[in-house]
């Protein structure tokens, strides 16, 4: 029989988690270093790589982390409005989330002054998107960091606006993104194709949502070998993969299609009742379903190396109302049943943060809880075991209780298993939400 954590212990852990998040929320802005309202997150290299240096770790301010924590806390509050300590945290972080926006679009990073001169000759007085503290050396990598706005952060950022209006009222002048923003960048009738999608994903002209909001380079007649040649000479200006000064960069000069990004977009569209209006939603459902049937779990998400991030993202989109994911959800249930360890944990590939067991278990547990919310049959003993495992992983330092951050994002493609983003606050928020949902199924 699975060990069952008492409800009082679960409630205490939720309270401790919220206290930790309250105490760890940043109160002071140091421009270019840290920002009031955010939580600590880290951008780190696990091994040496060209242009990015050796093993290192730097604090990083980014939209994904801040909007992610905001949305978790907002969902928790709407599920239990007695949790009033959440409200000040939301009010403090929300302006910080908006700082990553340009109109209705969002970027992973803020616009900041360049770290160095980015081209020969006179420099324009212009800001660029870049990490806050990570040391980028040389013009090439600094120009490459100036990435375009993207569908992932735009979905998360607009979901934060949706939650803010839901909780605090609709008196603010902010307009939520409509489906056209996402439908303007679909994987159809293209004259280019990302090498990672070609090698590992297949499904050409899927019609699903592409990641980057920008004009990719085009070939008159695309061929993988042409694309590969350009990627091999990425450091030369003649390559489509070469980043140019002060121009928003799409990595490798080619847009990509990521299953987790698509699930995140579907969550926002479903929450805001825009899914039916979106041209890409049905194809996004099919794209995710095809990938899930294929079952290449370790290479599923371009930017998401954790094996169970897909399960979490899809289950959340289903719970948000996207019934087009029901077939995929059934496949995910089968995979979750097959891969849970005896102690209740789940694990990713060894190269991912030494199996990334805590983060994998948090994602898998939330996936099961979301799926159960959506009416799927999930044996409660499986959830009991996972909750018990998560409960035992909590840490206490300086009278604070938290869960150690695992991998929730990466640099993608060639640095997918090297350049990681982690945050104790993000993982602690995930576990707190899992505990809250668990109390409803006890």
Question: What is the meaning of each model-derived region?
Answer:
Residues 3-442:
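Preference for long, amphipathic alpha-helical scaffolds in soluble/luminal domains
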């Amino acid at each position: 029989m699975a060990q069952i954590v008492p409800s009082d212990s679960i409630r205490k852990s939720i309270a401790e988690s919220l206290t930790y998040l309250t105490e760890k929320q940043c109160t002071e802005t140091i421009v270019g270093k840290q920002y009031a309202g955010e939580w600590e997150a880290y951008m780190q290299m696990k091994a040496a790589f060209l242009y990015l240096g050796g093993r290192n770790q730097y604090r990083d301010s980014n939209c994904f982390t801040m909007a992610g924590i905001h949305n978790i806390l907002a969902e928790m509050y709407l599920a239990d409005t007695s949790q009033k300590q959440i409200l000040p945290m939301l009010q403090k972080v929300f302006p910080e989330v908006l700082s990553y926006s340009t109109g209705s679009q969002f970027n992973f990073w803020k616009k900041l002054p360049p770290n160095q001169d980015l081209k020969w000759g006179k420099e324009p007085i212009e800001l660029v998107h870049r990490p806050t503290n990570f040391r980028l050396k040389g013009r090439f990598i600094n120009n490459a960091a100036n990435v375009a706005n993207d569908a992932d952060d735009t979905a998360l950022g607009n979901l934060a606006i949706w939650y803010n209006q839901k909780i605090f009222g609709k008196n603010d002048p902010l307009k939520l993104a409509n489906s056209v923003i996402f439908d303007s960048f679909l994987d159809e009738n293209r004259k280019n194709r990302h090498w990672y999608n070609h090698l590992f994903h297949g499904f050409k002209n899927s019609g699903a949502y592409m990641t980057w909001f920008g004009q990719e380079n085009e070939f008159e007649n695309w061929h993988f070998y042409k694309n590969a040649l350009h990627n091999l000479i990425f450091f030369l200006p003649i390559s489509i993969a070469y980043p140019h000064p002060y121009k928003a960069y799409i990595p490798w000069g080619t847009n990509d299609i990521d299953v987790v990004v698509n699930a995140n977009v579907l969550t926002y569209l479903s929450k805001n009742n825009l899914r039916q209006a979106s041209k890409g939603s049905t194809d996004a459902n099919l794209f995710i379903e095809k990938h899930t049937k294929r079952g290449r779990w370790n290479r599923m998400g371009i930017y998401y190396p954790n094996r169970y991030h897909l399960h979490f993202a899809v289950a959340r989109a289903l719970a948000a109302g996207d019934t087009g994911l029901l077939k995929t959800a059934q496949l995910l249930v089968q995979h979750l049943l097959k891969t849970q360890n005896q102690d209740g944990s789940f694990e990713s590939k060894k190269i991912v943060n030494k199996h990334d067991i805590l983060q994998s278990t948090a994602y898998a547990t939330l996936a099961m809880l979301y799926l159960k919310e959506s009416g799927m049959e999930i044996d409660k003993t499986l959830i009991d075991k996972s909750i018990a495992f998560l409960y035992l992983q909590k840490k206490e330092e300086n009278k604070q209780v938290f869960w150690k951050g695992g991998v929730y994002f990466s640099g993608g493609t060639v640095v997918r298993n090297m350049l990681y983003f982690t945050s104790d606050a993000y993982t602690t928020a995930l576990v707190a939400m899992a505990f809250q949902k668990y109390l409803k199924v006890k």
